[in-house]
Amino acid sequence: MTSRGNHGSKTSSDKHLGDSDFVVVANRLPVDQVRLPDGTAIWKRSPGGLVTALEPLLRQRRGAWVGWPGVINDNVDLDLTIKSIVQDGLTLYPVRLNTHDVAEYYEGFSNATLWPLYHDVIVKPIYHCEWWERYVDVNRRFAETTSRTAAYGGTVWVQDYQLQLVPKMLRIMRPDLTIGFFLHIPFPPVELFMQIPWRTEIIEGLLGADLVGFHLTSGAQNFLFLSRHLLGANTSRGLVGVRSRFGEVQLKSHTVQVGAFPISIDSKEIDQATRDRNVRRRAREIRAELGNPRKILLGVDRLDYTKGIDVRLRAFAELLAEGRAKRDDTVLVQLATPSRERVESYKILRNDIERQVGHINGEYGEVGHPVVHYLHRPIPRDELIAFYVASDVMLVTPLRDGMNLVAKEYVACRNDLGGALVLSEFTGAAAELRQAYLVNPHDLEGVKDTIEAALNQLAEEARRRMRSLRRQVLAHDVDRWARSFLDALAEAPARDAT
């Protein structure tokens, strides 16, 4: 990634600027606060594909990361005073949030308004003016912290739906910066997006960037249409390609590029971890602990209503009832990571899923031999990889998902060319993983038929499918995703910095 050249002359206010040439802006910092037995608070690095992909660039280019550290802070004055956290050589700048910020900006507008709307209104979005006002206020704080962090002429990469207003705000504060934005969740169809009372403000916010990126070409096309419809902007009319043939929005002052950049995983690292003898041994132990069944079905998800956990449970129960899956030699393991536990719809979902699991085990299980094994807690990385290796069929059945990296992780783990991937058509991953067993999660009979086919696939068919899937996942990793976006951002049309 290279600089796009002269951004204009510096001003007398440059003494207030930061010294970071490359700044990542995300809702969360890549750290968690941990309390030691003596009560001391320390910061511990949290795992994640995004920081893994960007860490080399952050180190090479005097990089910094702006985000919320995950700690609710009602005692500190929420001014613009920046105190950095240095963790493993990375410089992190916290944006402090208080109880009201978390309730209204994060749990409210981000996750009870935008999240359900962008995921096809599986749950009805809630619109509150107070939530919107808090969203604007918190986005402004992120922009102000970033403005004070970035060096003159630097590059800023804003991440995801919680921060859609930051590009425009930052553009006004710092016209010298090169700004990119990437949306990690689906961008909705036009008719759904138009429901948002603040639809124009969101599109204007995103258009503060030089490059706006989505997982899929459909999201890019929807965004181009909305830019024409809501703002009267001139836009390109041709189809947007994947990492190519970018769309353009031509505004009075500048041109914004729009593209599709499917995100991925650190597939080579996962493939290597799978080969560890301890992971292999743990995979064998998992099968033994489950009673050495003939087939293990696996689901791995955040506990979220978009993930279709109830669909796979219902399909599995009916397969057992119809004798198409045998209760004495087939088990389903569902690993559900806790998520947004203070949001009401998530509380209801957890109760529903756990009731469903109990009903299936009560109907088809035996004492000491449940047919569904359900864990509602975070799973350590090596343990998760062992589950991937141990399982025979991976069930990825979201009703809507921007990409779904679990599907790619499973494929990266299967260097034995075993296993089968059942994958929802409504994930971004389905556009790339065409040799999976693709399924419509809204068609229960189709889900059942597909799971049955995956359970009974022949070994040669399994190898053929998995070999093709692995070629795709290993070649298109998270490093390629990040570099393709940042290369395109570096080549975007330059703006006048004045």
Curated annotation (Swiss-Prot):
EC top class named in words: transferase
GO molecular function: alpha,alpha-trehalose-phosphate synthase (GDP-forming) activity; alpha,alpha-trehalose-phosphate synthase (UDP-forming) activity; trehalose-phosphatase activity
Binding site for D-glucose 6-phosphate: R28, Y106, D160, R340
Pathway assigned in UniProt: Glycan biosynthesis; trehalose biosynthesis
EC number(s) per entry: 2.4.1.15, 2.4.1.347
GO biological process: trehalose biosynthetic process
InterPro entries in the cross-refs: Glyco_trans_20
Key words, A-Z: Glycosyltransferase, Transferase
Reactions mediated catalytically: ADP-alpha-D-glucose + D-glucose 6-phosphate = alpha,alpha-trehalose 6-phosphate + ADP + H(+); CDP-alpha-D-glucose + D-glucose 6-phosphate = alpha,alpha-trehalose 6-phosphate + CDP + H(+); GDP-alpha-D-glucose + D-glucose 6-phosphate = alpha,alpha-trehalose 6-phosphate + GDP + H(+); TDP-alpha-D-glucose + D-glucose 6-phosphate = 5-methyl-UDP + alpha,alpha-trehalose 6-phosphate + H(+)
SUPFAM superfamilies in the record: UDP-Glycosyltransferase/glycogen phosphorylase (SSF53756)
Marked site positions, Involved in alpha anomer selectivity: W115, I185
Chain positions recorded as UDP-alpha-D-glucose binding sites: G48, G49, R302, K307, L405, V406, A407, K408, E409
A Gene Ontology cellular-component term: cytosol
UniProt superkingdom: Bacteria
Pfam families hit by this protein: Glyco_transf_20
Gene3D superfamilies, per database record: Glycogen Phosphorylase B
Job description of the protein: Probably involved in the osmoprotection via the biosynthesis of trehalose and in the production of glycogen and alpha-glucan via the TreS-Pep2 branch involved in the biosynthesis of maltose-1-phosphate (M1P). Catalyzes the transfer of glucose from UDP-glucose (UDP-Glc) to D-glucose 6-phosphate (Glc-6-P) to form trehalose-6-phosphate. Probably also able to use ADP-Glc, CDP-Glc, GDP-Glc and TDP-Glc as glucosyl donors.
Assembly description: Homotetramer.
Family listed: Belongs to the glycosyltransferase 20 family.
UniProt-recorded name of the protein: Trehalose-6-phosphate synthase
Organism this protein belongs to: Mycobacterium leprae (strain TN)
